[in-house]
Amino acid sequence: MSINSTLKREGITIINQLNTMEVNTIAANISEKLLKAFPEHNLNKSDLFISICRLNMYIADMPNDMAMAKYFYKNNSIYFSSDMNLEDLNTLAVHECLHYIQTKKNSHGKLLRLGIYNLETATNTGMALNEAAVQHMASIATNSKLDTVKYYNMELCTESPDFYPIQTALLNEMMYFTGSYPLYHSTLYSNDVFKNTFIAKSNIKTYNQIEKNFDLLFEYESKLSNEIYKLSISSEGSTNFNKIKRINSRIDDIKKIILEITLETQNTILVNCFNSELNSIRTLEDIKTFQTKLYNFKHLIISTYNYNFYNEFYSDMMNKLEEKREFILKFGNISAINSFRNELSFIEEKTFGFQFFKELLHKLKMLIEENLRAKEIEK
């Protein structure tokens, strides 16, 4: 299908193309922001600038149910909605240029991967998780601050209150366990570092479920946007109150589904990640660290009326920590074997540096010493 046919199908009508000076200004601004925001990821300002300058950028009429900007990989073009203001243009330009940077295609131009989103897998999931990652990074690059907002009867904290607020709030919860480096690296370089790191902090079933839930949230938010648009059209001088009532009912139902998926995802992150860390506790100091980490997680919690899951989980964990404390006081530190298995972090393939082998040898030494100590006790 040709680009013109694709644009027509998407409902995008070009108004005008940004000139070379306008594109160069955007490219200079974005390359500087990305370099400053993510200095540890080996980005080259000059290369970024030249690469972004190759993009075609357009102002266009966009459908109401579409995002305010869209990147098309087939013709390396970004289309900005004519309805957006200049402030949104700055953030969305970073967002769409990140999509451009993370694009991986084969020699025939077929799209293989966009950051976290791997199109070569059978499940073809991860699109929404990647969108959230890109939006999070765009917000960081434009110096957006954490803000507490309300959506669908939920109160949440995000640096992106206007674009993907729920997804970025949930992503912050995931990064609480992985740190930001794996996410940024996978988003920029299209690899599985973030995925493998999160799996190491939880399990593969948990990651897959979260990935699916992000896609579901994206799907239902699109449906919600469509229904809200229908309501705005129907409300303009309409006397068909039954139709308006039906649309409002569908809107309420979709909001409830979004709330349920969000809380289910949050609970999945909470339970599986902290249970994994609980199993890694070996010393009394580990218990203190775990307790502090569990307590501070409350600052990331997406809350709503009658949501008590975190408080109940916290209480349950405190009881389990007390059991761990009593065991350590009675028998000494817990074996390092399980901890070793959980703590070996996943790193990108073919990047086994000196530090990695140094840490590996250290952990192997710990295992050997632990086994020798166990044999001495048996004697």
What are these regions (language model features)?
Residues C97, K104-T123:
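Nucleic-acid nuclease catalytic cores
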Residues T91-S107, Q135, S139:
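Active-site recognition of the HExxH zinc-binding catalytic motif
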Residues G11-E87, S107:
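Auxiliary, metal-adjacent structural segments of Zn-dependent hydrolase domains
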